[in-house]
Amino acid sequence: MVEDSIGNETVNQESTYSLPFWCTKGTKLRDFQFKLLHTRRITSNDFLYKIGIKQSNSCTFCGEATENLVYLFWSCKHSNAFWKDCYQWIMQNTSKIENFNLSEALLFGLINNAKDLLRHHLLLIARHYIYTCKQRDTRPNVRMYIHIVQRTVKIERQIAKGHNSLDTFKKKSPRLKTSPF
């Protein structure tokens, strides 16, 4: 088992790279997480500015600082507010999710264990949503995120039905109180 430390947290690399395959059947989310972990595949304005594609290296959401991946996904006041709203929604609308602390490592999918696949799935959807907002030049908001979660759950249910794994799906998704079924 390969482990690294980020801040005060220990990261299990094997679990980190396997996590998207455990928590979702959606290839779009799996692909996104893989690209995020290989930082040059998910680009920030800082990188795009350096190679001459963008006119500015400023944050897409606030325009107040240089946009690198940590700033985009964590430090920007708009991303940070979204994460707080997202956390509150997750805690209010799921059952059996232990209280957890928002941290850079967790929000990037860098984990020391994969105990709660529903939580990791919801955070993966949130990461992908933030990046989609960057691409569309819009700010993330929790109402749209909730809509995306509901749509994703419907898709995951259809995939589970097609693969005769509905029982496994039902163990995870009914814990989501806003489940669309």
Where are these regions (language model features)?
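Family-specific functional microsites
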Residues: V2-F181
